[in-house]
C-alpha cells in the first residue's frame, strides 16, 4: 500500500489550473524529484502533500498515522532560540496524531530531541540566529525529523548552501530510510539523489519512473519525435499553400 496517494487532484488560485486532475503515489523509501518550469506549481504540490493546502477537487489518501515534514525554500527570519529549543518546538507543536506512539512522555521526547540533534551533528546550546545558512537549514531539517516522518518534503534544499553543506546533505539523504520528495534546480544534487523523476507541465504530472540521466535520454527522444511530427506538418501545410495559390 502506498504511503500517500493523490487521486484526480485539481487546484487553481484564480488563474489557470496549477494541478489538473493529477494522480500521484509515493511509496516507502523512495527518493523522488519533482521537476518543472518556474511557476508551474511545484511548491504548491509539496504543500498539498504536507496538508497545508486543500485541493479544489480530488482525494488525498494517507496511510494511517502518516507523518510528513516540510522544509521550505526560505529560512524564517523571526526564528530565535537555541538549537535544542527549536528542534524541541518541532515535537511540541506537531499534530498529536502525527507524533509517534513511542515519544509521548517527557523523557522520551527529550531523548528523541537529543538523538536527532546528535544525528544532525549540531550543538544543542548554539543560538540559531548566529549560525551559518547551512547550519540553520540543518536545524530546520532536524526540527522536521524529530517527529520521525515517513515522508520528507524538501523545497530547493541546496539554496544558498556552500559545497560542504551540500555534500553533508547528500550524504544524509542517501542514508535516510524514509521517503524523500524534493524540488531542486541543482542538477548535480538531483542526479546524485533522485531515483524517480516526476515532471509537472501545464497542470499535468508525468511520471518518468527513472533516474535523472535516463530521464534526459527519454525526454530528448520525446522532443525529437515532436519536432519531426511538426516538421512533417509544416511541409504538408506548405504544399497546401502552394496548391491554393495555384487556384486548383
Question: What residue spans do the PLM features occupy?
Answer:
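Short cytosolic helices in intracellular loops of multi-pass membrane proteins
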Residues: 231-247
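Charged, low-complexity surface segments at secondary-structure and domain boundaries
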Residues: 99-101, 245-248
Amino acid at each position: 500500500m502506498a504511503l500517500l496517494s493523490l487521486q484526480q487532484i485539481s487546484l487553481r488560485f484564480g488563474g489557470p489550473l496549477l494541478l489538473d486532475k493529477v494522480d500521484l503515489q509515493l511509496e516507502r523509501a523512495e527518493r523522488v524529484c519533482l521537476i518543472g518550469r518556474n511557476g508551474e506549481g511545484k511548491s504548491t504540490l509539496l504543500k498539498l502533500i504536507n496538508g497545508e493546502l486543500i485541493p479544489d477537487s480530488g482525494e488525498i489518501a494517507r496511510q494511517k498515522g502518516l507523518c510528513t515534514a516540510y522544509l521550505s525554500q526560505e529560512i524564517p527570519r523571526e526564528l530565535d532560540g537555541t538549537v535544542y529549543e527549536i528542534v524541541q518546538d518541532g515535537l511540541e507543536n506537531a499534530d498529536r496524531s502525527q507524533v509517534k506512539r513511542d515519544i509521548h512522555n517527557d523523557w522520551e521526547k527529550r531523548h528523541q530531541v537529543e538523538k536527532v540533534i546528535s544525528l544532525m551533528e549540531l550543538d544543542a546550546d548554539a543560538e540559531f540566529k548566529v549560525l551559518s545558512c547551512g547550519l540553520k537549514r540543518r536545524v530546520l531539517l532536524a526540527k522536521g525529523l524529530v517527529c520521525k516522518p515517513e515522508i520528507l518534503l524538501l523545497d530547493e534544499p541546496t539554496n544558498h548552501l556552500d559545497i560542504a553543506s551540500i555534500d553533508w546533505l547528500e550524504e544524509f539523504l542517501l542514508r535516510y530510510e524514509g521517503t524523500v520528495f524534493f524540488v531542486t534546480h541543482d542538477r548535480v544534487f538531483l542526479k546524485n539523489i533522485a531515483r524517480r523523476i516526476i515532471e509537472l507541465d501545464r497542470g499535468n504530472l508525468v511520471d518518468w519512473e527513472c533516474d535523472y540521466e535516463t530521464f534526459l535520454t527519454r525526454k530528448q527522444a520525446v522532443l525529437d519525435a515532436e519536432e519531426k511530427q511538426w516538421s512533417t506538418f509544416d511541409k504538408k501545410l506548405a504544399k497546401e499553400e502552394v496548391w491554393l495559390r495555384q487556384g486548383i
